[in-house]
Amino acid sequence: MVRTPKKKISKKVTDLRTRLWPDLSPDDLWHRNVYDGFTSVPRTMPLIMNIIDDLAPGSKRTSMTYLALWGQAFDEMYVSLQNADELAFHSGYTGQRAVRSWKERMRELAKLGFIRIAAGTAGEFSHAVILNPHFAIRRLHAAGTPGLTAAAYNALVERGIAIGAEDMNVALPEERQEEAEAAK
């Protein structure tokens, strides 16, 4: 499969944008290579968020907690949870039960396999690591987890293939470990 170079794609998109919005100044756009304060997120994030909310019990907006964690993470996917009040607010929770609601969502994300939490000086919720969401969803699908519909999973797979998300096709870490042990 021959891929079009990114520069060529970028030029095509820039040319189209200029034709559609000739009065638009490039200074009005967000440039991740110019401004600080950005993070990389999977292009499948909207689908991931929908799946998380489908899997979370009740009408919880667990996906907003997940997105807030991504907003705090760097490439190491580690998040300090030292300021629970702030993280709860960023997740959309206010009032007396804000931190409690946030902690419930954090537990749900950990239970579903999207994050891992570690205790420390701030108590039970001191540190978090964000796991590969595609792997988490693939595991949930393989386990037949209620709430993960075929339509949602297939949409994620389709989008993953369309954007070249190799982690939708490669063996999961535990599968690679089993293969390595079997080869011994």
Where are the regions a protein language model picked out?
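Short recognition helix of helix-turn-helix/winged-helix DNA-binding domains
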Residues: 1-85
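Charged/polar, solvent-exposed surface patches and flexible loops
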Residues: 50-54, 67, 86-89, 104, ...
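Short flexible/disordered coil segments
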Residues: 2-16, 134-143, 181-184
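Short, cationic/aromatic linear interface patches
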Residues: 25, 117-120, 126-139
